Regions:
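HIT superfamily nucleotide-processing domains
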Residues: 1-171
Length: 171
């Protein structure tokens, strides 16, 4: 996206303080940080919706956030962390998935506040059931696709030596 600051950082059309970069993601120090050492991680591709982010990039983003946090804790001696994932229409100026890691210090005067409300227990129960059932379906679909891939792998290697090795791995 032409007007997205995160895309401009990823494309190196504006300067930044890059902490980590690979083919998929980039991690930079926040130039307008809420606290010392705050940093941002985001995909290089313009992806707006977290639910469309592939698992590999998602895992990379959170893994890098952890390791950079470890390094920063050794340097800055912070007392805690807040990690904020922004996606889609969440009040941000640019609709580009970002993870913002904010080191926290005693008396840093940062306030994170949510307007909370008492949720209806029947809705919570309904939502819990829906989510757990969907997770079971996802898990079954994954296992079925994995079994299908194994069967295709067996068909490719008809030679008995390979077949024997395949059985040995699973015994």
């Amino acid at each position: 996206m032409d007007d997205c600051v995160y895309c401009k950082i990823a494309n190196k059309t504006i300067p930044s303080y890059i902490l980590y970069e690979d083919n998929d993601i980039i991690c930079v120090l926040d130039i307008l940080p809420p606290s010392k050492g705050s940093f941002l991680i985001f995909p290089k591709l313009h992806i707006e919706d977290y639910t469309s982010l592939n698992d590999e990039i998602n895992q990379k983003m959170f893994t890098i956030s952890k390791y950079i946090s470890i390094i920063l804790k050794n340097k800055l001696k912070f007392d805690g962390l807040n990690i904020l994932l922004s996606s889609g229409e969440t009040g941000q100026k640019y609709k580009h998935i970002t993870i913002q890691v904010i080191p926290r210090f005693k008396d840093d005067n940062i306030k994170i506040y949510f307007n909370r409300f008492k949720e209806d227990p029947s809705f919570l129960e309904e939502l819990k059931n829906y989510i757990t059932n969907e997770l079971i379906k996802m898990s079954q679909n994954y296992l079925n696709s994995e079994k299908k891939e194994e069967k295709e792998e067996i068909k490719k290697d008809v030679d008995y030596k390979s077949l024997n090795q395949w059985f040995e791995k699973r015994i």
